[in-house]
């Protein structure tokens, strides 16, 4: 597996220092405000919730392992940093690693991936926009399937050409309006495993996924060119 403290240290330029916890001797960042030491028994479960989650809807009550805290340590006047559910910080922590994974998986089936964006409107979880440079018209559908494989919770994905900025919702909508035709570019995947956070899914997360090919046909590129002007 990946040791998360090593990743954090790399992101911090190797400047983090670590100490060993008094009770268990496990490493922790030396500048921590609060340190909790305890045990997590996977067989001891308790109901958690309901509370609102990433999608700003109430999540189902779930049975989760119980943490038994044995010692608590803190600095004088410690600061407790709280991440608000559904807020931008929560969305970045959840979505950013998935964007990287989607880019990796799509890159395995399409020669050139230009951009991947999990949209804020989809909670940076359910909706993605992927920009590719097609070599053949089937590349867009392969990109959709790869995106769904990379991020199983993904519900809808739109594939666009490199001239469409994935982070600009107006441009993405324009691509759907002018380049998408449902009889040739719509992919429906019924009975797929999705996100249990999605209130429209079944209790086990089963849902129907949708892919939209908003790229233009390669042999008709001239017809679909966007005029570059500023009003």
Q: Which residue stretches match the model-derived regions?
A:
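Charged, compositionally biased interaction regions
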Residues: 1-231
